[in-house]
Amino acid sequence: MCIRDSYEVVRENGEDLLIGNSKDWHQPGSGYMQYDLMQKFLFKPDDRFRHLLNFQFSNTTDIPRYDRLTDMKKDKPKFAEWYYGPQFRLMTAYTMEIADWLSADKVDFTVAYQKIKESRHNRKFGEVWLGSRNENVDVVSLSSDWMKQVDNHRIHAGIDGALNFLSSTAHKTDVDTGERAALDTRYPDGQNYMHNIEAYASHQWEITPRLTLSDGIRLGFSTLYSSFETAEFFPFLSQDVKEVKQNNMTYSFSLGLNYNPTKDWKIALALSTGYRVPNIDDVGKVFDSQPGMVVVPNPDVRPEKTINADFNVTRFKNDRFLWETSVFGTYLFDAITLKPHTLNGNTEIEYDGELSEIYANHNSRRAYVVGSTTRLKARFLEMFMADASLTYTYGDIIDGEDERMPLDHISPLFGRVGMTFQSKDDKAIVEFYSLFNGRKKLDRYNLNGEDNIGYATVLSLI
């Protein structure tokens, strides 16, 4: 890997050329712009009814994939172009709240629709074909919550569900002539959907003014279907992975205690279980995770399950001082991780013109994540607030009796420091902050997952 600040790629007269970069510390192909709009409308005809309309819109310019643009092959860039197309998101939601209805203090209903578009575009250096893979996602969701206060007990119950539809298309374009041709898709090119519905109930009991107990339960059902219609680009796929069907029942529990020994201290302990149901990204796609490695579908992936614990201590003094520290841990069963895979008895296939090792998502036996975070806030001179936080996380996959390897997606030590000015009338807020992180050592990279050790920075070698 190199820092791509010494050159950039241009195409002139049907040829890719490397030209020097005359701007020191300028990295061509590393920036983009994003636009976000949000509008809410609130209508409250009386004390019992409340109507809320929520509109959100977000879009971007093209987003260069800077890490892929640093790949080299025979002293030349591997790619002349590699970028995400505009990432489009539109959401509209309607919420109605009703007080004193159905024996509840408050009932609310929310119905929402989201449309999401994204695309990936790449062209190898010296070649004319620009590959474009496009994804369109439509999500319709409905949720309802019922709340009742009975003496020192607060009870919530409700349901929520979502219908998710995915359309995946692809083509390639000759950048010189504009000619179009077919191309393999990122996700199955047939019908793709994932639907889920869940019901929950939670309870909060103020045992004493200083001690509160909370508990809850959630039950869920999900169904998934994904199919490949065009066999032209995936002749290596067997019939059992060309059509993936899954139905999963899930459940989780939670239990927590909050204790205030004094008015300035709070101690909290929480225990819970959790789950994550495989989606089409987990079980259905074919893609090159990194050079020389191709990921194929595995319809046998099961839901991940977790046991979680969190211990928190907070010291506060009105709105002038806050110190909070927590220690957390998660134990995963059937953790979904990438592992070497065989397909029709083969461990390697040719994909996108390159011989690649075959990988697929599998349920590893166990994994764990532990860590700690601390935060400090202090107000001074009435209108200024200093804020700092620091987080450390560590995780391993336990595969077999004694075999361990790093869990991917684990961040190195990271934190934030900042300063905020807020006027006395709250009409002006100005904030300055800085984000920082430590290095991630090479031996903490997951070699088979998505940590992408090939793009590790020089600091990881120290």
What spans do the regions from the language model cover?
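Acidic/polar loop-and-plug regions of large Gram-negative outer-membrane beta-barrel proteins
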Residues: 7-21, 58, 65-83, 106, ...
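Outer-membrane beta-barrel translocator domains and adjoining extracellular loop/strand segments
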Residues: 6-7, 64-72, 119-127, 167-176, ...
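C-terminal structured "cap/appendage" subdomains that terminate the fold
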Residues: 459-462
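Extracellular loop and loop/strand-boundary signature of outer-membrane beta-barrel proteins
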Residues: 22-27, 75-84, 95, 125-134, ...
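Transmembrane beta-barrel wall of Gram-negative outer-membrane proteins
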Residues: 4-62, 88-92
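Face-selective signature of the C-terminal outer-membrane beta-barrel domain
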Residues: 42-58, 85-235, 249-254, 258-266, ...
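Gram-negative outer-membrane beta-barrel transporters
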Residues: 208-209, 221-222, 328-331, 341, ...
